[in-house]
Amino acid sequence: MMRKLFNALSQLHRGVLICGGFAAFMLFGALLLMLPISQTGTKEVSFLDALFMSVSIVSVTGMSMFDLKTDFTIFGQLVVLFLMQVGGLGIMTMMAMVGISRGRKIRLQERLLIRDSFNLQTPSGMVMLVRKIILMTLSIEFCAGTILAAYFFTQNGWIGIYQGYWHAVSAFTNCGMDIMGNDVGFAGMAANPLVSTVVCISMLLGGVGFIALDDLLKHHRWSALTLNSKFILVMEMILIPLGVIVYFLLEGNNPATLGHLSTAEKWQSAFFMSISSRMAGFTLFDIHAMNNATGLIIMLFMFIGAAPVSTAGGIRTTTIGLLLLSLWSWIRGRKDVVIFHKRVDPECLVKASNVFTLATVLTFLTAMMVFLLEPASHFDFEDALFEAVSAFSTVGFSMGLTTEWNIPCKIVIMVAMFIGRIGVMTLAVTFAGRPKSQIKYPKENIIIG
């Protein structure tokens, strides 16, 4: 029976298996959150709300209509911790880890699944990659958790140790949820330079990606790094300061956000929000209180996201970087895109263009559906677009509309978060048919522009 089931599953497209694996685990998470032992009983949790929570957590988005501190028990919070840990690492990575720990040989089909889940080119070295990912994850979370636990212990006693490690996982997986309660939130924690720095580093390490981290650990010299790692690091060096400047200039005089802080605290908070806006979605203030100009720019940051093979989402920093360099090369009349004296494969540029186009279309479709499906909508299209970008990019920022959506809107946002987690490349490959012929037709140009 099991052999027949395995043979049937092996015939499915690997993209279908990846999507199915995430969907099944999200459903499993919803059932765990529905258990009476998971809830405090302060607020009714319907199955749809539990499923929304599970999808949000496993996709490491972090959108929630509940207060994890008051609405869920310690067991429920541990369920959330488990879901975001698996969601951050990926279903296929966790399954491979279980197989490796039991001494079982990882089959070629499983190696291909891991490769496809990370959008890598070759299945070679997948077992070693999984081991490194697990080791890096546990090491970073343990170090960050120990520092946070020591701080929270001085503030909250023994429960502070639990809070420290819980938030370390939330930061590294870029889920961006907290268990401090809506009355305190993360704003109170991030006001402390120690907590802010540790959480920022955790978010950044999770957002840089496992491939780049492994490359940095193996090679300590810039010249020895791969082109991929160099490009990822350069994009971070550009985007982080850019985000800091945006927040400081546009929100520095806004009393509802950063205006009430000292100059040093403004810079610190701007740095924190610059990283969080593309990765975890931790927030230090009410997002709805931001200036309109800031909201538009933050939507762009969320859409860009973090690096490939990371715990964060978005279209990826490499995608937007390649598109901008391709545009610059075209303006200068150059056929090839050259980065650090290396010519980029044209196939990479095609993939980047396709990812950007598909992601843009899906995001706007999501925003339109949310806006149209809410009959008594008291928000404008810009708010709907902000929520759609946040869901698709798995950042989790919200204009405060999460608790007010009707059932169709919740389903639309869940689909957006799901697609954002598996990635548009996986989605496209899953539904794309196999090429049926290699016939080359005559070439002719079409007028553009």
Model-derived features: where do they sit?
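Membrane-proximal intracellular helices of multi-pass ion channels
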Residues: 1-449
